[in-house]
Amino acid sequence: MSEKLMTHTQWIQLCDNVVRACASQHSQRAYRASSSMYRAWVARTKLIFLSKATVLRYRDYLLLTKKLAPKSINLHLTVLRRLAQEGIAEQVLEPSTALAILRIPRVPNRGVRAGVWLPREQAQRIL
């Protein structure tokens, strides 16, 4: 099966569908920003809009060049996975391409503390 090339109009429609599916306004804003950032990066690099190789390069760009935290990168990957799913539904993306994108692993969050951590002295006082 040959790779389908997505038009700009199809990309915008996919992004709109994915953003509208979010219940929270905060999620909508984050998804919109993430898809816009990805689209701008793809335009600069002149790569295929949505392919496994492009998403992997983008993940590396976010990690190595932008130096984003794993949770931020994983948000971007989640948006791209949703776009891939929507691409199948709208028949603008080959199912094999979308499945390859869906199988891209999350960036591990090892060694990164989440939440508010108290210094040892304050924690002992509370206990």
Model-flagged regions — what are they?
Residues 12, 16-29, 35-113:
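N-terminal core-binding DNA-recognition domain of tyrosine recombinases/integrases
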